[in-house]
Amino acid sequence: MATDGASCEPDFSRAPEDAAGAPAEAAKKEFDVDTLSKSELRMLLSVMEGELEARDLVIEALRARRKEVFIQERYGRFNLNDPFLALQRDYEAGASDKEKKPVCTNPLSILEAVMAHCRKMQERMSTQLAAAESRQKKLEMEKLQLQALEQEHKKLAARLEEERGKNKHVVLMLVKECKQLSGKVLEEAQKLEEVMAKLEEEKKKTSALEEELATEKRRSAEMEAQMEKQLSEFDTEREQLRAKLHREEAHTTDLKEEIDKMKKMIEQLKRGNDSKPSLSLPRKTKDRRLVSISVATEGPMTRSVACQTDLVTETAEPLKKLPLTVPVKPAAGSPLVSASAKGNACASAASVRPGIERQVSHGDLIGSSLPTVPPPSTDRIEENGPSTGSTPDLTSSPTALPSTVSPASGHTPTPPPHSLHSPCANAPLHPGLNPRIQAARFRFQGSNANDPDQNGNTTQSPPSRDVSPTSRDTLVAKQLARNTVTQALSRFTSPPAGAPPRPGAPPTGDVGTYPPVGRTSLKTPGGARVDRGNPPPIPPKKPGLSQTPSPPHPQLKVIMDSSRASSTGIKADNKTVASSPSSLPQGNRVINEENLSKSSSPQLPPKPSIDLTVAPAGCAVSALATSQVGAWPAETPGLNQPACSESSLVIPTTTAFRSSINPVSASSRRAGASDSLLVTASGWSPSLTPLLMSGGPAPLAGRPTLLQQAAAQGNVTLLSMLLNEEGLDINYSCEDGHSALYSAAKNGHTDCVRLLLNAEAQVNAADKNGFTPLCAAAAQGHFKCVELLIAYDANINHAADGGQTPLYLACKNGNKECIKLLLEAGTDRSVKTRDGWTPIHAAVDTGNVDSLKLLMYHGAPAHGNKLQEEPGLAIFDLDQEEHHEGTSKPVVPADLINHADSEGWTAAHIAASKGFKNCLEVLCRHGGLEPERRDKCNRTAHDVATDDCKHLLENLNALKIPLRISVGEIEPGNYGADDFECENTICALNIRKQTSWDDFSKAVSQALTNHFQAISSDGWWSLEDMTFNSTTDSSIGLSASSVRSITLGSVPWSAGQSFTQSPWDFMRTNKAEQVTVLLSGPQEGCLSSVTYASMIPLQMLQNYLRLVEQYHNVIFHGPEGSLQDYIAHQLALCLKHRQMAAGFPCEIVRAEVDADFSKEQLVDLFISSACLIPVKQSPANKKIIIILENLEKSSLSELLGDFLGPLENHSTESPCTFQKGNGMSECYYFHENCFLMGTIAKACLQGSDLLVQQHFRWVQLRWDSEPMQGLLQRFLRRKVVNKFRGQVPSPCDPVCKTVDWALAVWRQLNSCLARLGTPEALLGPKYFLSCPVIPGHAQATVKWMSKLWNAVIAPRVQEAILSRASVKRQPGLGQTTKNPSQGQQAVVRAALSILLNKAVLHGCPLQRAELDQHTADFKGGSFPLSIVSSYSSCSKKRESGAWRKVSTSPRKKSGRFSSPTWNKPDLSEEGIKSNTILQLNCNRNASLSNQKSLENDLSLTLNLDQRLSLGSDDEADLVKELQSMCSSKSESDISKIADSRDDLRRFDSSGNNPVFSATVNNPRMPVSQKEVSPLSSHQMTERSNSKSKTESGVSRVKSFLPVPRSKVTQCSQNTKRSSSSSNTRQIEINNNSRDLEPTQK
């Protein structure tokens, strides 16, 4: 074994050495580790690791083998049994190593050598691997740093570019601003110089004026001295003349004496005693003369007395009717005027007219021709209570009328005098008067019912308290007038057949003499029982409730007729209704505060609970609290808090009072005794807690207490059981005075109320504060309970201790249904509280408009007399819808509306101070409202009002007069002016009483200026949103100076003129319904009315007129419908009147040219109109204006060719020879007084007609430049303003969208037609002027558009397309083939479909479903374009090389293979896109993105021109054009084209020399025609002319050099700079469009 092991071991150990050593040496020789890559190093590492693992295995195997060999070698030959062998072993082991020889060829040495070598190799490899890994890490770090640096470099470069761009932009802006500032500085300097020059001139003028004043002063002093001298001379002369007169008089007396002596001597000689009669006769005549004078002076005195007494309503003729009226008045019941009364009447005569004038100023004119109709319930208002004008006040007269019946017996034949104007006396007597007489009587009765009686009869009624301190000045006169008119009107009254009056007790003592009134059913049919505590539902309108009687005076006891109960099915007794005493202490009221006392508020107990399973706390509170207008106050034992709820703005103070209730436990209280008070009727307290339940059911005490519990709880079963018991007092009241009926009514338990009423409970039982069950139900809003209580004759006018009636409480809490029921029952609206408040005060104090309207209008007739409405009503009815209040008269008198409380505040004061504008509006509708009534602090309602209420009060009696602009009468068929309107309403003038004539003039001027600027603005802006300058003219040139005259109604007026009356009085007196402004027209030699009628700017019309006057020969040409004929005729009219004003006779001659109009006819026209005169004849003084219309129907060169020279030079130096009918020829010439105007309905001239162009002055009316460009927009805007009566609607209004759509259709149609190369189909704005403007009916506009499309647009487009597609275009020829081919028909249908969908239906304001319904009405609405696509692809083979070379746009390629269909037009955002030529011809911005599409289409057009010149098929061109319109995806929305008009770009192609121009802001410059046609000499001339006329501001054409992205913004800024438009530049664009496209995307 040793031999085997020895022989094998060297071989085994050599193999790993060779395996490990050979690769190491090879690696040294073949490659270097430093040059290896990362992947190679990794592979080498993996190989080495495999080698190491293999060597480890070998080492382990060798170690095991070594152990075996060692043991074999050392111990193999010994035996343990042999000791000597053991000794030998130990010996050998103990010997030194050097001495020992290897037993065999020692494999350990070999193994150790191998291991040492491997260890060395492993260490070297590990060092090399570590070095390689470190180098790799370093390389990775360097790569990352390099990438970061590159990114940072890119960012910095981009930032640098941005900063450069920004800096350039800033520099450009700064340069621009510097230029602007320098320009402004120059302007300011120039202005300063002008101002300084003006100042110097003013100084010179001032000094000159001072010198003149000094001279005038000297002259005046001299003249004064001269006057003094002359006066002294006159005095001297006068004294001399007086002395002479005295001498003459003395001489005359001497002569008279001598004459008398001579007469006496003669008479003595003739007769003896005849001298005495002759002496007495002069004395008698003298006496008679004196008597006549005294009669003349006494007569008017007598008449004036009678007039003041009896004839106030007939002030126009006071002297004629005196003798008749004085004796008749006493017979009618008026007391005769005694001597003392006469004196009083005469003394008060001076106050009559002021009183009448004051009434007129408030709308209460006495001398009204058509009296207003009062409502029938006017009688019912007053008869329930006393009239304040004739009976004592409720609160101020404790002892009024101690006996009422006895005085009445003495006056049974006639009513007492004071009752003639008292509603209490007259209302029951004549309840069904003629409405006109009733209205007139109502005016006199209601205007001031507080006036004391002045008829001298003081036994009928004591003097009343005067509520109005400001109405004492005219009491006497108004009282006399009221008596007189009321007496006269009472003759015409008679009792009516229907509707008997409600029984009442007037003060005259006619008690119980009225017929009974039937009462209908009071239960609401089908009315469900309302849960306790919940607000009852609103019932249907009652068929009619009875009118229960009420005492007119609190002291009277009225005995009702028992026949009332017999006519009804409801239990009623003949009771004596006693009202509460009226002598109550007057309470103090602070403004906006209420002093609440215990005596002025009833106590309403909460509902007790008997159900043990229901938690009682707040069982009825939440619903009640939320259903009321005001909130009931929270209660404390000793403090009563006032109402302060969400809906009430009252902030009253609180007043502590002694409480009679001790809030201990529920068992210690009596049921029904509550601390819930009806505090000034303000509402229910949300924090009420039922007193009978504090954690458990209330103990059932005595039967009366249990009865109240059941009534408050609404337990009908228990209540009915208790009522069936005998001996139970159902009227028992607790210590607060609350009965069971009170508790049931307060909590709204209708069934309980009915049970108690059927059990004969006292319906008017009041608590200790005087509140009845009706008061509680009305305050809580339980209208069914109110209805029941009224049916059982509850006192509807019962006043509590504080004076609160059920109506007052219902109004205070805004319970409409309760108010309606009470008013229908005839409650008194005029009862005042202790503080002097009426129900109207209560309704206004809470801001409840519905309650106020019910109080004022309920019971009024449905429709009043519209002709006789008060002036205040007319204002509000202008702005409000038709409603009951607006068409009927209020039923409350003016005294009640103007009644002031203890502080002097009226309802208007309260509404104005709290900002309740709606309530104030309702009050202002009452004609008798006195807004100037002052309170005790001398403040009016306006003084205490909020801002919006102040505005309302200022406009109270304002008149709204429409202001209209008139342009005079427009002749029918006036040359395209059929759609023009004569008058337009621009606004409504608000004329107040205090408006002066200066303010009126300024308002008219400002309204005109605002209107002119509004209709000429760009957007839909309201007049309030725009800040106008009243001195600047509008963009159309009109201003206030354009006005010719103004008429106020039918009265002429000029700005600045003043009348004696104020504008308000003047408008009312003259019944002026409108103010009409007439603009200056051609009759005055002005064109303002023409500007307003046609919306052509005034400056342009004046420029046209100047051209006519300067050049004498002007032709207006443009597309059909451009108003050429109208412009020419109006200019001729203006020129005619100017010449006539200068003293020259003038005549206008019109001639319509047709195809048969020959040159001979034109010669005859010129000769007959004396425009062409023989050379031998001298020109006449007469001016001749000739208008040749429709020149497009004839050849200009043939018609006017022989007249070109003579027309250009109006003198004998340019004669022309014409043959007459007899064969003789004669020379003629055009004289200087001849003007020639022509009209051509054609967009451009062609062929031989261009020869005529240079001999005339041409005015081109282009559709895409002014005046035609903005004419339609201004015209339709004015139409909308007129339709909305002067108001500009908001831009989102459907009418504005419809008008904008019609405007966009016109522009888009012309853009598409221009792109298709069919200028003869272009349309002027005339056809679109008739666009209907109907608010809310956009369908009408779409129908009108369909008719216009079918009748005008589609036939013109069809003719133009066939004209282009049939033959090669020749100038002047527009012929069409009679039988178009199928391809031509397809092209026409495709063109119509594309135009319809891209230009007409695009942007339609209708919804998609509605639009689809109307699409069928349009001719050519649905046509599939697959034919176009196939046709286009087939014709692709015939394209020339140049076409394929240039037409490389990707949008052309993508469009060639698309086949969209237009059966249902796609109007979505990604559907239809506008085409580029639209953008070319319609107002685009010159951005680089648009430059691309411009170049594409320019290349298209240029190559189209090349193909035409090569004789290619025009159908293919049209198909290409149409398809590019369909498939253009890169263009902006077509609806945005019409938004800007500053940058118009057009392209012109004339022959082989195309001109690319962009006209910027040049509305008047004619440009070359947009037409693709072969080159001709005439077109070359035209092109050169147009090229010279275009502005220098053409777009800069883009270079063919590549453009980086960062310069796009810079290029867009430079596009407005001028550059040349040479041919080479154009070719560069076309050839390099492909290079530009990548930079555009």
Curated annotation (Swiss-Prot):
The protein's UniProt keywords, in alphabetical order, are: ANK repeat, Cell projection, Coiled coil, Cytoplasm, Methylation, Phosphoprotein, Repeat, Synapse
According to the UniProt entry, which residue ranges have a biased composition of type Low complexity? 1612-1626
Q: Phosphoserine-modified residues are where?
A: 1512
Chief location: cytoplasm
InterPro entries the UniProt entry points to:
Ankyrin_rpt, Ankyrin_rpt-contain_sf, Cortactin-Actin_Reg, Cortactin-binding_p2_N
Region labeled Disordered — which residues?
1-27, 361-433, 446-472, 488-588, 1442-1468, 1544-1641
This protein's GO CC annotations: actin cytoskeleton; cell cortex; dendritic spine; FAR/SIN/STRIPAK complex
Q: Where are the ANK repeats?
A: 702-732, 736-765, 769-798, 802-831, 835-864, 903-933
User: Which Pfam families does the entry link to?
Assistant: AAA_lid_NAV1, Ank, Ank_2, CortBP2
Q: Where in the cell is it found?
A: Cytoplasm, Cell cortex; Cell projection, Dendritic spine
Q: Which residues form a coiled coil?
A: 119-276
Source domain of life = Eukaryota
Q: What GO molecular function terms would the record report?
A: protein phosphatase 2A binding
SMART domains linked: ANK
Show the ranges annotated as biased composition (Polar residues). 385-405, 576-586, 1551-1562, 1570-1579
Q: Which Gene3D superfamilies match?
A: Ankyrin repeat-containing domain
Compositionally biased region (Pro residues): 497-506
Bias-annotated ranges (Basic and acidic residues): 1580-1590
PTM-bearing positions, type Asymmetric dimethylarginine:
491
**Subunit and interaction comment:** Interacts with CTTN/cortactin SH3 domain. Interacts with STRN, STRN4/zinedin and MOB4/phocein; this interactions mediate the association with the STRIPAK core complex and may regulate dendritic spine distribution of the STRIPAK complex in hippocampal neurons. Activation of glutamate receptors weakens the interaction with STRN and STRN4.
Q: What does this protein do?
A: Regulates the dendritic spine distribution of CTTN/cortactin in hippocampal neurons, and thus controls dendritic spinogenesis and dendritic spine maintenance. Associates with the striatin-interacting phosphatase and kinase (STRIPAK) core complex to regulate dendritic spine distribution of the STRIPAK complex in hippocampal neurons.
* Official protein name in the record: Cortactin-binding protein 2
Chain's gene name: CTTNBP2
